[in-house]
A protein has these predicted regions:
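Conserved active-site loop/cleft motifs that coordinate metal ions or position small ligands
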Residues: 31, 229, 255-258, 281-282
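Hydrophobic beta-strand segments of well-ordered beta-sheets in folded domains
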Residues: 92-94, 202, 226-227, 253
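Conserved beta-strand termini and adjacent loop/short-helix elements that scaffold enzyme active sites
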Residues: 6-8, 73, 182, 230, ...
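Short helix/strand-capping turn motifs
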Residues: 250-262
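Catalytic core of soluble alpha/beta enzymes
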Residues: 101-244, 265-268, 273
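Conserved beta-strand segments of alpha/beta enzyme cores
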Residues: 2-4, 69, 178, 226, ...
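N-terminal capping/lid subdomain adjacent to the active-site entrance of alpha/beta enzymes
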Residues: 1-147, 173, 269-327
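Short, solvent-exposed coil/turn elements at secondary-structure transition points
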Residues: 8-11, 76, 185, 233, ...
């Protein structure tokens, strides 16, 4: 069974990177993607591989909806470009990246203001700091950005404890902006601490980092808070797992963060998952052999990923038994 390592350029810098790489392979029931970010250690990357095994061998739970509303994704770009991106997306909800290293709060305010103007008063707007603010910075920034009627602020600070304190401080100041937890759920030993400590109002769930669609469904049930399904900047193969999760959740009160395929300048399927009128269809994908060849990583990059896969597979007992693949 062949393993494909892809290397695709991004349309703009995102999360500090300009290219996205990962591994694709076909299992008994379908194609799978494994694309943990390079800085993640092997143990963290193992959860991503468990998700890939699920994609390849189990398929998806029964959907309860055939369309997933999604948000436009706005990187830390200039206000004019931010407006253009939202307009082109056709989405009624937008997520704006803030707290980018090297940028100022004033730049964040200008970007968010431009997006709010583009969306109009009825559009929904959320910001994502990726833990980029200290507690004090988060209080000031969210109080300032609250003027734009935020749906929520995602992962303003890194630690769960800071999120708890932040919610308290904002409440005392009369700043009514809900807090969403992302990294505090997917990059910690106990994702339920967010629930137990009252650290967030909304849970962000990402399939690969959390070990698969079924694991996310179980987690959503015990977290007992509204859920937003987001992507990990994958190709359409990986995005399809996020769509499967969003389609299977009993309730879906928010637009999902699954429109990130628009950040890639290429893809590996015949019809990439892209929003139409602000939504993604729950549909099967066909991997394109020509696209696999076109996006194939160079030898050095491919070697790095295959060596990494070899190490991480040793931590995932399901790998050889369920895929029939020995590394």
């Amino acid at each position: 069974m062949e393993i494909h390592v892809y290397d695709i350029e991004l349309s703009t810098r995102f999360r500090g990177i300009t290219r996205r790489q990962g591994v694709l392979f076909e299992g008994p029931v379908g194609w799978a993607e494994w694309s943990p970010f390079p800085e993640y250690d092997d143990r963290e990357a193992a959860s991503w591989l468990r998700a890939a095994v699920e994609m390849a061998t189990l398929g998806w739970p029964e959907p309860v909806r055939d369309e997933i509303p999604v948000n436009a994704i706005v990187p830390a770009i200039a206000p004019v470009a931010a407006s253009e991106r939202v307009r082109a997306s056709g989405c009624l909800t937008a997520k704006v990246k803030v707290a980018e290293r090297g940028q100022t709060l004033e730049e964040d305010v200008s970007r968010v203001a431009a997006v709010r103007e583009e969306l109009g008063p009825r559009g929904r707007l959320r910001v994502d700091a990726n833990g980029g603010w200290s507690l004090d910075e988060a209080v000031v920034a969210i109080a300032e950005l609250a003027q734009f009627d935020l749906e929520y602020a995602e992962q303003p600070c890194t630690s769960v404890e800071d999120l708890v304190e932040l919610r308290s401080l904002l409440s005392r100041r009369g700043v009514a902006v809900p807090i969403a937890a992302d990294e505090s759920i997917r990059r910690v030993g106990d994702p339920l601490r967010v629930r137990d400590l009252g650290a967030a109002d909304v849970a962000i769930l990402k399939v690969q980092p959390l070990g698969g669609v079924r694991r996310c469904l179980e987690l959503a049930e015990v977290l007992r808070m509204p859920v937003v399904v987001s992507s990990a900047l994958e190709t359409s193969v990986g995005l399809r797992a996020g769509v499967a999760l969003a389609a299977a959740l009993p309730e879906l009160p928010y637009a999902c963060g699954l429109e990130t395929g628009s950040l890639l300048l290429d893809d590996v399927v015949t019809k990439p998952l892209r929003a139409q009128a602000g939504a993604l269809s729950v549909t099967d994908l066909v991997v394109d052999p020509e696209a696999l060849e076109r996006t194939r990583a160079g030898d050095e990059m491919a070697g790095w990923w295959l060596e990494r896969l070899h190490r991480v597979a040793a931590l995932v007992p399901e790998w050889p038994q369920t895929t029939g693949m020995m590394l």
